[in-house]
Amino acid sequence: MIPDVSQALTWLERHPQALKGIQRGLERETLRVNADGTLATTGHPDALGSALTHKWVTTDFAEALLEFITPVDGDIQHMLTLMRDLHRYTARNLGDERMWPLSMPCYIAEGQDIELAQYGTSNIGRLKTLYREGLKNRYGALMQTISGVHYNFSLPMAFWQAKCGVVDGEDAKEKISAGYFRLIRNYYRFGWVIPYLFGASPAICSSFLQGKPTTLPFEKTDCGMYYLPYATSLRLSDLGYTNKSQSNLGITFNDLHEYVAGLKRAIKTPSTEYAEIGLEKDGKRLQINSNVLQIENELYAPIRPKRVTRSGETPSDALLRGGIEYIEVRSLDINPFSPIGVDEQQVRFLDLFMVWCVLADAPEMSSDELLCTRTNWNRVILEGRKPGLTLGIGCETAQFPLPKVGKDLFRDLKRVAQTLDSIHGGEDYQKVCDELVACFDNPELTFSARILRSMIDTGIGGTGKALGEAYRNLLREEPLEILREEDFIAEREASTRRQLEVEAADTEPFDAWLEKHA
């Protein structure tokens, strides 16, 4: 089932320097909660400045949903330590609140009024909040409070020069984009390995079902928790953060222009379902527009091709201008065993897997085949640890045992690990392979199995509160290592100033501005 990558791996072993200079970044979302686990109703902490313009800490859907962002970094330890500094400083400035350590929220009642993230009075700030109003009205606020980790990854120019013979300009744009699309297609085919190893949401609180009937064979504990005994990541299931209305958009990952055309089509295609919501009620705007996607970011995807946007540029315009610059992996649950929601083992694994995905052959995929890849993901998400589970290739009928496929993949990853270790010295990457491959013979070692044992004992709420309290105490006590207190104070003031400048620069009323930008 695994493509034959031996030639590409041999090439890599001859050109190890091609992997020198991998760049990465992390984003981690987390809900601010009270000591009893309920959602904090306070505004964004003053110590963190402006959520609109702060370079390290912002908010996602809700005012209480923090998002930590590391700068682009070539050093794994430095990136993780900086992420930890962001958590340390925040923990010291949350009063009695703490950061929820799980992807799935718990103490949020159906229909509870969740305050949307606020970004001030500028047109762009109001647009961001209106977009979130649209998300709430389309999908419900509860789904939007699910948290995850995003891992951003780019290969050095030396890789593309050695592999594809790229030179500067248009040639580089096309060849590098084609290489990243190959990575993305392989991710759709084999990325289920991420929830298998690191999925950490095998259970949900009853409020998540919102009284709707479900065909999933949930088991229920006395405290009202629903779980599937072999599930890995319900966050990635239809109960979690997905968007069924997008599955027939026909967006593919074969070609830059084709992909962008599909994306642009989706933001212009009217939706009868969303038209029923309306654009306004009692003088209050309900969504940016009633199209299938309000803006491009609404496209749900487990992985995204990205380029840093310039002022006023949409994500797809940036891609057309310069091609794909980096990849955003979006399938990581919060790691409940780490105070910062992600750890070094995961980052090293993702490095290895991304390199494998860019090396392995990846035939072009129609939108139908893209949908077929969802079958494997769903199996792993809902019953990944089930004995005897099999997976298929695309839309074909042949089936293969998951543990065998996983171990075959890791045989390749071990060779990538040896190459990366040869550049950096030590055996860190190989050690990660040895630790993780054991999960295929013993699923009890996976994140989902480990956290489910705790959840069955004390419930999602009990588990989340205990971990949240422990991490709060730990982070508050740890000294900062890279950033200093004065760096945070300076950024608080600078971000507040930048927000005021954005607000002062607006010349049009919001409604008129929105007509042009929506």
UniProtKB/Swiss-Prot annotation:
GO terms for molecular function: ATP binding; glutamate-cysteine ligase activity; metal ion binding. GO terms for biological process: glutathione biosynthetic process. One of its GO terms (cellular component) is cytosol. Pathway: Sulfur metabolism; glutathione biosynthesis; glutathione from L-cysteine and L-glutamate: step 1/2. It catalyses: L-cysteine + L-glutamate + ATP = gamma-L-glutamyl-L-cysteine + ADP + phosphate + H(+). InterPro entries: Gln_synth/guanido_kin_cat_dom, Glu_cys_ligase, Glut_cys_ligase. Keywords: ATP-binding, Glutathione biosynthesis, Ligase, Nucleotide-binding. Its EC number is 6.3.2.2. Gene3D superfamilies: 3.30.590.20. Belongs to the glutamate--cysteine ligase type 1 family. Type 1 subfamily. This is Glutamate--cysteine ligase. It comes from Citrobacter koseri (strain ATCC BAA-895 / CDC 4225-83 / SGSC4696). The gene is gshA.
